Amino acid sequence: MPSRPNPTRPKLFHNRTKTLFLILTISSSLVIFFAILYFIYHLWISLLNRSRTIPFDVAAASPLKLQLFTYKELKLATNDFDESNVIGKGGSGTVFRGITRDGKLFAVKRLDNLSIQTETEFQNELQILGGLKSSFLVTLLGYCVEKNHRFLIYEYMPNKSLQELLFNEDGDSCLNWERRFGIILDVAKALEFMHFGCDPPVIHGDIKPSNVLLDSEFRAKISDFGLSRVKVEGGYGVDLFSQELSGNFGGESTPQTAIGTPTHHEVDFALALQASSSSKNSRTSRNIKEMSLNSMSLAMDGETKGKEVSNDVVLSCEDHEFDQGKEMNLLSPNSVLDLGKGSKQWGRDWWWKQEGSGELCSKDYVREWIGSQIDTANPDWDDDKKVITTPELGVSTRTIDKAEHRDESGLNESRFDTLEEKFAKEEISERKNKRSKNKKKKHRNMEEWWKEEEHQEEMNNKKKIGVLRIKFKNHLKFPHFRYCFRQKGENSVHDREGEAAGEFSFRRGWRRKSNSSSKKKKKNNNGSMGSEMWSGDLFSRELSSTTSMRGTLCYIAPEYGGGCCYLMEKGDIYSFGVLILVIVSGRRPLHVLASPMKLEKANLVSWCRQLAQSGNVLELVDEKLKDGYNKEEAGLCINLALACLQKAPELRPDVSEVVRILRGEMDISSTAFEFSPSPPGKVYGSRSKRRS
């Protein structure tokens, strides 16, 4: 019989095929799985280590051909960035001294913390300074861009910066008067080259001693173009001239007047508040027509409320608040009050009123305004209105609660020449007791309303600040002075919180504390703080020890404190004026000494203005120079600095005029210097639409 086939062989073959298929399936699945894991890991690492900077275009970075250095070359040249080779430190990076193989020295600036701001400054250096060649500017030799590393290579300046020579701790200054005057002239020529020698003009935006470097012959050169801008024709521009300062918005030119002595129709209410906040003891004109107090709330009858009211005799409520011991000011018969329009003119400036300074506080203004708006049927506000109507003459007269309670003698000394006013005086004495009984209840209701309004505003502002934070995370930042460009919503939040904390705002200057503890401090603080707090006129004991504030804030022009986002040539002129005073005096623009007798000299700009008023400007000259300086040149420099430090940009001289004045080819303009505090400028659209 034939043998039967073995049935185990097909089964074995089938099992092997099944096993092989299973192995291939599992292995391929594992390979795909690990490939996906590797891809995710690689993507996560790349996103984690990605540089949070703007895309960098090397080809378009600089119009000139700059040398491209490698990271290894710079590491060898600086001895692995050793601390012994550090020659300077700035806000965005550290500067090292490097040596090439052939023995040449150069300076290497390393950007420490990469961000949108530092990357923008890095590209500004390449685009602006890389395209400029001048003997008055530091030469940019090259750059390095590798991964997250950013380096700028400059020519080496052996005498370092002007700041180190002026403020060295050893006290041995090698800057005699000839060198100081030469440095001032060199900086002026550098600005002249940037403003008039470049097409389009270049605005530096950060003129200060640390950015003025000195070569082996003590010739000055300007460096650090991280905040500089190119002025482009056809873009958006601003006119920060003194139209608002003079109250002239129609375009007509009016002569500039000091803030303390306003003239009719020239000073607005906000400006008067700034003048009052700059000095406790100063008294500006209380005429309602001068200060444009169109929103003064007068209680009227129902028939005349909201309409134009012309009275023969109207008591002035403001004079009782400002000076209770004096006679009441009377409005002229031609004066017209429009409550509807006037209420809109207050704006945000009326919140600047300071408590404890003999002036109305913000709550008083609200009480006065609400007293004129709420119907007399409301018992809580019945006493506030106090409408006294004489049916015989038809004259409505409003009495003042605070003037009566605080100073009864002020009313007794007042002169009443009409029967209507005598009748008003009798009515006041009859209702005096009734008002005193309801006073506590009335103020309690007002405080409750006030707290509700504050709470509602804080809730609304928190929503605004949340939206602004999201925008900032999306890199919606301006690359200029960061502290000048807070958004409007953020400003309102900080302003409201600052009223209780007494913090610093670049838009409104210093705000005093409004709580009870701040009132105690006000009694001890006789010095006043005005709008000069955020410009070169800055004076504060708390800020005197802050290096960054000294380094930049004191050199900023006043118009940038008002929220200006665009640099102008006159801003460089203001910074140059502060620089002149620093070079001549050999001291910082803000320096509080230990002796309280020398506090008036702490603010260099204010002290210089005081000396100019007294006619002894040479007292400002550095004591280290003794008598080894030219008095005519020193006086010329100080007077030129005062001309550059004028609050209105259009009153400052051009840099070409500055150079001619320093050379003796031109005299300083006879325009009277303004020694009043500098109010914040506002931004107005320019017809030329120029963008800088």
From Swiss-Prot:
Xref: InterPro entries: At4g25390-like (IPR044576), Kinase-like_dom_sf (IPR011009), Prot_kinase_dom (IPR000719), Protein_kinase_ATP_BS (IPR017441), Ser/Thr_kinase_AS (IPR008271)
Domain of life of the organism encoding this protein: Eukaryota
Record's keyword annotation contains rRNA-binding: no
EC number: 2.7.11.1
Key words, A-Z: ATP-binding, Cell membrane, Kinase, Membrane, Nucleotide-binding, Serine/threonine-protein kinase, Transferase, Transmembrane, Transmembrane helix
SUPFAM superfamilies cross-referenced by the UniProt entry: Protein kinase-like (PK-like) (SSF56112)
Top EC class for this record: transferase
Disordered: annotated span: 427-446, 511-533
Membrane topology: Single-pass membrane protein
Annotated Protein kinase domain residues: 81-673
Residue spans of biased composition, Basic residues class: 432-444, 511-524
Protein name: Putative receptor-like protein kinase At1g80870
Species for this entry: Arabidopsis thaliana (Mouse-ear cress)
